[in-house]
Amino acid sequence: DSRNCPDGSLFIALKGESFNGNAFAKFALESGCAYAIIDEGEYAVEGDQRYILVDNCLQTMQQLANYHRRQLGTKVIGITGTNGKTTTKELISTVLSQAHNVLYTLGNLNNHIGVPTTLLRLKPEHDLAVIEMGANHPGEIKFLSEIVEPDCGIITNVGKAHLEGFGSFEGVIKTKGELYDFLRKKEGSTVFIHHDNAYLMNIAEGLNLIPYGTEDDLYVNGRITGNSPYLTFEWKAGKDGKSYQVQTQLIGEYNFPNALAAITIGRFFGVEDAKINEALAGYTPQNNRSQLKKTDDNSNVFICNTDLYIISWQPQVISH
């Protein structure tokens, strides 16, 4: 944004349907940017070496983000899924932050622009990164995975959303599974998987799996103990682990596997159980997701997700 250029920053002239970032490059340099990457030479000022001319600014940004990610030793966790990506990402990041310096996607900036923008925020002090990746057409998760190069991954679920972009439910599964395809080829990779979800288990062959769910012998397992209105559950590690009870501020049983995912990843990266429970109990949804709000007459209103364009009712996810 040319209106927000800290001294020494880099301006990249992205284009949209109603704007051309090249037209703002001069203003960005005058506002404090050290350099401006443009892809239309007529916007450069002759003799000013602060302009960097490239073929395509967006592609350059994506390549730069991948290069930057490779220079740092940060372990990267990639997350995708039809629903629950953002809440699960927030829960995972909250838990991991109890013991790590974590970079994570802000809001749901999970597309071809948001993902590289997040990666470019990586700093040497970050030892973990949680990167959310979204898709509305085949090949998009493959493309984003090649930018992110995650070391670990999680697919929250697969459901019948954005079918117009994927063509069919099978297309959704295949596209979300592109994260698994990338990790299957990466040496030393790990996949955190909801063992109760048959769709995910069916496409997880050949992966190093860390499972969570309701079965007693899983890496992390648990059961719901209450949901009126806030989700309460028990969990333990393995068959003989110590059992814990957690009272969350989350609405909806559908958040149970999201919480188990955060516990699983937290334990995998060495967060103490007490710290995990403290983080989950203290987490309050912020993005108009699974929130209980009061009206002026003090009655409760349950907000599922005000990003209406991605809401979908998916009984098949619940039943599997």
Q: Where in the sequence are the language-model features?
A:
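Thr-Gly-centered strand-to-loop micro-motif
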Residues: 12-15, 105-106, 131, 248-249, ...
